Amino acid sequence: MVTLLAKLFIRDHENVTDPGVRQAYGILCGIVGICFNLILFTTKALAGLFSHSIAITADAFNNLSDAASSIITLVGFRMAGQKPDSDHPFGHGRIEYISGLLVSILIVLMGFELVKSSVSKIFHPEVPDYSPVIIGILVFSILVKCYMALYNRSIGSRIGSVAMKATAIDSLSDMIATTVVLIGTIVSAASGIIIDGYCGVLVGMFILYSGFVAAKDTISPLLGQPPEPELVQQINDIVLSYDNVIGIHDLIVHNYGPGRTLISLHAEVPADGNIITLHDTIDTIEHELRRKLNCNAVIHMDPVSTSDPETLSLKAEVSGYLDQIDPKLSMHDFRIVKGPTHTNVIFDIVIPYDYPVSDQEVMDSITKRIQTSHPDFFTVIEVDKAVVQ
């Protein structure tokens, strides 16, 4: 249904990289989610009222909170689509992440309240009144939530929306929660054993779990996280396709919201190359990154010696030392500066964040190996952390 609506109401609906199309998908899915959740709330609330079931009533109000979540997501997409201004030169894209976080908080609050009321129901149980109509409503709810989880996950992945992925997780947890309520309903109707309150606790725990998972997924891009490996590979392929670029390092992808990405990196170029030609190459690369990946790029040129035999030999030697210590280690910006009494060997090493050995121990190990072979060489080592894995 959502696919059909997208074809009818979203112009150029296949072009999901276009910010306008992406925003339209978010708004469409938000409206559909509001409608579905209001229908489910109404039917479940009536079913819970007539059956005196706390689990069904709680599940109904969970759907009402889902409708509120869909409204927040819809508003978030609208606000995130605003153009950059003087106060927010990088746009408003991160509002989408904030809306996803608000949805997560609502999910957690609803789960807490449900567990609280269900525990009370365990100690003060009431005999529920079930009927085939009640069971039919629950089955209908499970099918609807399954569909909502599928379309939110599919479109969320397609347009790269953490808010919609959070909604998909919420819908999936709702489906599982309603299934638990249905099982409890059937067991109570068949055996006379009242497990309504216990089912409510299970539903509440599912909701709490889904809320924390969704919060984690929305907080990560707000705090900053590594870029997708596919994007890193695309950047590498584009930059290294130019003959004047020997290598790249210090790649950082700054995410200011979906479709608002800034790339900064260091491009290694021949130290003896023509500066005008090299600068022209860098400009061309920045333009290609912007055109192909829709990312603004800032590239710093790092001159690298490609003709000095001593530098190349020592670089290969140090690279071998790093491989002996751990293949996960790498280096860049390698150069040597000769003086009257000693020679400085200057380079940066890249160490993963979760590396079990301290930075100082790694540097000491490298320095010891170099000075064993070259006693008059001093090392000047800077440590970089592997932002991009």
Regions found by a protein language model. Name each.
Residues 1-26, 217-389:
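Peripheral (non-transmembrane) domains and long loops of multi-pass membrane proteins
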Residues 1-240:
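Alpha-helical transmembrane cores and adjacent cytosolic helix/loop segments
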